[in-house]
Protein backbone atom coordinates (compact mmCIF):
# COMPACT_ATOMS: atom_id res chain seq x y z
CA UNK A 1 0.00 0.00 0.00
CA UNK A 2 2.80 2.43 0.89
CA UNK A 3 4.69 1.91 -2.35
CA UNK A 4 1.54 2.12 -4.48
CA UNK A 5 0.46 5.31 -2.70
CA UNK A 6 3.94 6.77 -3.19
CA UNK A 7 3.97 5.90 -6.91
CA UNK A 8 0.34 6.47 -7.89
CA UNK A 9 -1.38 8.36 -5.05
CA UNK A 10 -0.61 11.93 -6.03
CA UNK A 11 -0.70 12.97 -2.37
CA UNK A 12 -4.25 11.72 -1.81
CA UNK A 13 -5.34 11.68 1.84
CA UNK A 14 -8.49 10.65 3.70
CA UNK A 15 -9.38 14.35 3.98
CA UNK A 16 -8.85 15.11 0.28
CA UNK A 17 -10.63 11.96 -0.91
CA UNK A 18 -13.45 11.84 1.62
CA UNK A 19 -12.61 8.18 2.27
CA UNK A 20 -12.08 6.46 5.61
CA UNK A 21 -8.38 6.03 6.18
CA UNK A 22 -8.47 2.23 6.16
CA UNK A 23 -10.46 2.27 2.92
CA UNK A 24 -7.95 4.61 1.29
CA UNK A 25 -4.98 2.46 2.26
CA UNK A 26 -6.90 -0.62 1.11
CA UNK A 27 -7.43 1.05 -2.25
CA UNK A 28 -3.67 1.23 -2.75
CA UNK A 29 -3.25 -2.36 -1.58
CA UNK A 30 -5.46 -3.32 -4.52
CA UNK A 31 -3.57 -0.93 -6.81
CA UNK A 32 -0.25 -2.53 -5.91
CA UNK A 33 -1.59 -6.00 -6.68
CA UNK A 34 -2.96 -4.85 -10.03
CA UNK A 35 0.40 -3.42 -11.16
CA UNK A 36 2.27 -6.43 -9.77
CA UNK A 37 0.16 -8.88 -11.76
CA UNK A 38 0.62 -6.81 -14.92
CA UNK A 39 4.39 -6.88 -14.50
CA UNK A 40 4.37 -10.63 -13.85
CA UNK A 41 2.36 -11.23 -17.04
CA UNK A 42 4.82 -9.12 -19.04
CA UNK A 43 7.84 -11.01 -17.70
CA UNK A 44 6.20 -14.39 -18.37
CA UNK A 45 5.49 -13.24 -21.94
CA UNK A 46 9.21 -12.44 -22.24
CA UNK A 47 10.10 -16.03 -21.37
CA UNK A 48 10.51 -16.09 -17.60
CA UNK A 49 8.81 -18.78 -15.54
CA UNK A 50 5.93 -17.59 -13.36
CA UNK A 51 8.03 -18.16 -10.24
CA UNK A 52 10.90 -16.10 -11.66
CA UNK A 53 8.52 -13.38 -12.82
CA UNK A 54 6.91 -13.07 -9.39
CA UNK A 55 10.35 -12.72 -7.85
CA UNK A 56 11.73 -10.32 -10.46
CA UNK A 57 8.75 -8.01 -10.98
CA UNK A 58 10.16 -4.48 -10.49
CA UNK A 59 7.36 -3.30 -8.21
CA UNK A 60 7.86 -6.33 -5.91
CA UNK A 61 11.59 -5.65 -5.74
CA UNK A 62 10.80 -2.04 -4.83
CA UNK A 63 8.41 -3.22 -2.11
CA UNK A 64 11.05 -5.55 -0.66
CA UNK A 65 13.57 -2.71 -0.62
CA UNK A 66 11.01 -0.48 1.12
CA UNK A 67 10.50 -3.18 3.78
CA UNK A 68 14.25 -3.43 4.28
CA UNK A 69 14.43 0.36 4.73
CA UNK A 70 11.49 0.29 7.14
CA UNK A 71 13.18 -2.30 9.33
CA UNK A 72 16.36 -0.18 9.18
CA UNK A 73 14.27 2.81 10.36
CA UNK A 74 14.91 4.87 7.22
CA UNK A 75 13.46 8.27 8.14
CA UNK A 76 11.47 8.86 4.93
CA UNK A 77 9.98 5.37 4.76
CA UNK A 78 9.24 5.25 8.49
CA UNK A 79 7.52 8.62 8.38
CA UNK A 80 5.31 7.48 5.51
CA UNK A 81 4.48 4.29 7.41
CA UNK A 82 3.51 6.25 10.53
CA UNK A 83 1.23 8.49 8.46
CA UNK A 84 -0.53 5.69 6.58
CA UNK A 85 -0.69 3.47 9.66
CA UNK A 86 -2.41 6.35 11.44
CA UNK A 87 -4.97 6.56 8.66
CA UNK A 88 -5.72 2.85 8.99
CA UNK A 89 -6.20 2.88 12.76
CA UNK A 90 -8.35 6.01 12.63
CA UNK A 91 -10.59 4.14 10.20
CA UNK A 92 -10.60 1.01 12.35
CA UNK A 93 -11.59 3.07 15.40
CA UNK A 94 -14.69 4.32 13.59
CA UNK A 95 -15.72 0.76 12.73
CA UNK A 96 -15.06 -0.61 16.22
CA UNK A 97 -17.02 2.27 17.75
CA UNK A 98 -19.99 1.45 15.51
CA UNK A 99 -19.84 -2.14 16.77
CA UNK A 100 -19.38 -1.13 20.40
CA UNK A 101 -16.03 -2.94 20.53
CA UNK A 102 -12.99 -1.95 22.57
CA UNK A 103 -9.80 -3.71 23.65
CA UNK A 104 -7.90 -3.89 26.94
CA UNK A 105 -4.60 -4.40 25.15
CA UNK A 106 -3.49 -4.16 21.53
CA UNK A 107 -0.30 -5.82 20.25
CA UNK A 108 1.19 -4.42 17.06
CA UNK A 109 3.40 -6.56 14.83
CA UNK A 110 5.63 -3.52 14.36
CA UNK A 111 6.42 -3.82 18.08
CA UNK A 112 7.01 -7.58 18.20
CA UNK A 113 8.92 -8.49 15.03
CA UNK A 114 12.28 -7.67 16.64
CA UNK A 115 11.49 -10.09 19.46
CA UNK A 116 10.60 -12.61 16.77
CA UNK A 117 14.03 -12.09 15.22
CA UNK A 118 15.63 -12.73 18.61
CA UNK A 119 13.76 -16.03 18.80
CA UNK A 120 15.02 -16.92 15.31
CA UNK A 121 18.59 -16.25 16.46
CA UNK A 122 17.90 -18.40 19.53
CA UNK A 123 16.71 -21.20 17.25
CA UNK A 124 19.89 -20.97 15.19
CA UNK A 125 22.03 -21.21 18.32
CA UNK A 126 20.08 -24.25 19.52
CA UNK A 127 20.33 -25.93 16.12
CA UNK A 128 16.54 -25.93 15.72
CA UNK A 129 16.72 -23.69 12.64
CA UNK A 130 19.22 -23.60 9.79
CA UNK A 131 20.54 -20.96 7.43
CA UNK A 132 20.55 -21.47 3.65
CA UNK A 133 23.29 -20.19 1.30
CA UNK A 134 21.14 -17.14 0.43
CA UNK A 135 21.21 -16.22 4.17
CA UNK A 136 17.52 -17.00 4.73
CA UNK A 137 16.58 -18.95 7.88
CA UNK A 138 14.32 -22.02 7.82
CA UNK A 139 13.03 -24.84 10.01
CA UNK A 140 12.63 -28.35 8.62
CA UNK A 141 9.41 -29.93 9.91
CA UNK A 142 9.22 -32.79 7.39
CA UNK A 143 9.94 -35.34 10.14
CA UNK A 144 6.78 -34.05 11.84
CA UNK A 145 4.72 -34.57 8.70
CA UNK A 146 4.75 -30.89 7.78
CA UNK A 147 7.06 -28.88 5.51
CA UNK A 148 10.05 -26.58 5.57
CA UNK A 149 9.11 -23.11 6.80
CA UNK A 150 10.77 -19.77 6.08
CA UNK A 151 11.43 -17.74 9.23
CA UNK A 152 13.65 -14.92 7.98
CA UNK A 153 14.35 -13.69 4.44
CA UNK A 154 17.84 -13.62 2.99
CA UNK A 155 18.00 -9.82 3.33
CA UNK A 156 17.24 -10.16 7.04
CA UNK A 157 13.65 -8.91 6.90
CA UNK A 158 10.89 -10.67 8.81
CA UNK A 159 7.93 -12.72 7.58
CA UNK A 160 4.53 -13.36 9.21
CA UNK A 161 5.88 -16.27 11.24
CA UNK A 162 8.71 -14.11 12.63
CA UNK A 163 6.16 -11.60 13.89
CA UNK A 164 3.78 -14.23 15.28
CA UNK A 165 6.59 -15.89 17.22
CA UNK A 166 7.45 -12.56 18.84
CA UNK A 167 3.83 -11.67 19.55
CA UNK A 168 3.00 -15.04 21.13
CA UNK A 169 6.10 -14.88 23.33
CA UNK A 170 5.34 -11.35 24.52
CA UNK A 171 1.68 -12.12 25.27
CA UNK A 172 2.57 -15.04 27.50
CA UNK A 173 5.49 -13.29 29.18
CA UNK A 174 3.38 -10.25 30.04
CA UNK A 175 0.18 -12.01 31.06
CA UNK A 176 1.00 -15.60 32.09
CA UNK A 177 -2.22 -16.73 30.45
CA UNK A 178 -4.02 -20.00 31.12
CA UNK A 179 -4.92 -20.16 27.44
CA UNK A 180 -4.42 -17.95 24.40
CA UNK A 181 -7.12 -18.29 21.76
CA UNK A 182 -6.59 -17.09 18.19
CA UNK A 183 -9.92 -16.57 16.39
CA UNK A 184 -8.75 -16.83 12.78
CA UNK A 185 -10.21 -18.40 9.63
CA UNK A 186 -9.47 -21.99 8.66
CA UNK A 187 -7.13 -20.97 5.84
CA UNK A 188 -4.59 -20.39 8.63
CA UNK A 189 -4.91 -23.86 10.20
CA UNK A 190 -1.47 -24.90 8.95
CA UNK A 191 0.14 -21.64 10.05
CA UNK A 192 -0.94 -22.07 13.67
CA UNK A 193 0.00 -25.74 13.68
CA UNK A 194 3.51 -24.70 12.63
CA UNK A 195 3.62 -21.81 15.14
CA UNK A 196 2.88 -24.10 18.09
CA UNK A 197 5.38 -26.72 16.91
CA UNK A 198 8.18 -24.17 16.44
CA UNK A 199 7.64 -22.76 19.94
CA UNK A 200 7.66 -26.29 21.36
CA UNK A 201 10.96 -27.07 19.60
CA UNK A 202 12.41 -23.84 20.98
CA UNK A 203 11.65 -25.12 24.48
CA UNK A 204 8.44 -23.24 25.27
CA UNK A 205 6.05 -26.20 25.42
CA UNK A 206 5.02 -25.21 28.95
CA UNK A 207 2.94 -22.41 27.48
CA UNK A 208 2.83 -23.00 23.71
CA UNK A 209 0.66 -26.08 24.36
CA UNK A 210 -1.93 -23.61 25.69
CA UNK A 211 -2.29 -21.86 22.33
CA UNK A 212 -5.64 -22.66 20.72
CA UNK A 213 -6.60 -21.78 17.16
CA UNK A 214 -10.38 -21.32 17.16
CA UNK A 215 -10.89 -21.84 13.45
CA UNK A 216 -13.98 -20.92 11.48
CA UNK A 217 -15.09 -21.49 7.90
CA UNK A 218 -14.42 -18.78 5.37
CA UNK A 219 -17.33 -16.72 4.04
CA UNK A 220 -17.31 -16.64 0.26
CA UNK A 221 -19.09 -14.60 -2.37
CA UNK A 222 -21.07 -16.30 -5.16
CA UNK A 223 -18.09 -15.51 -7.40
CA UNK A 224 -15.66 -17.22 -5.04
CA UNK A 225 -13.24 -16.38 -2.25
CA UNK A 226 -13.01 -12.80 -1.00
CA UNK A 227 -9.57 -11.27 -1.57
CA UNK A 228 -8.74 -7.87 -0.11
CA UNK A 229 -5.76 -7.44 -2.42
CA UNK A 230 -8.08 -7.77 -5.41
CA UNK A 231 -10.82 -5.64 -3.89
CA UNK A 232 -13.32 -8.51 -4.00
CA UNK A 233 -14.69 -8.07 -0.49
CA UNK A 234 -17.84 -7.11 1.39
CA UNK A 235 -16.94 -3.99 3.35
CA UNK A 236 -17.65 -4.21 7.08
CA UNK A 237 -18.79 -0.59 7.27
CA UNK A 238 -21.30 -1.12 4.46
CA UNK A 239 -22.56 -4.29 6.13
CA UNK A 240 -23.01 -2.49 9.47
CA UNK A 241 -24.88 0.34 7.75
CA UNK A 242 -27.15 -2.15 5.97
CA UNK A 243 -27.93 -3.98 9.23
CA UNK A 244 -28.73 -0.71 11.02
CA UNK A 245 -30.96 0.34 8.13
CA UNK A 246 -32.71 -3.03 8.10
CA UNK A 247 -33.26 -2.93 11.86
Sequence positions of predicted segments:
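NTP-dependent nucleotidyl-transfer catalytic core
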Residues: 1-247
Amino acid sequence: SMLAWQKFGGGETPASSGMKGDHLVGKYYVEFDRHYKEEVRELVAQGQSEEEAKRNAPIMREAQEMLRKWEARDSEVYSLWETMNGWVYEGFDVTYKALGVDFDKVYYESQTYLLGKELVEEGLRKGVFYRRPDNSVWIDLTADGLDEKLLLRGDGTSVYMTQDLGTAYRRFEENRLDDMIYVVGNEQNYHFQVLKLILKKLGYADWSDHITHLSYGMVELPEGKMKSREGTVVDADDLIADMVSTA
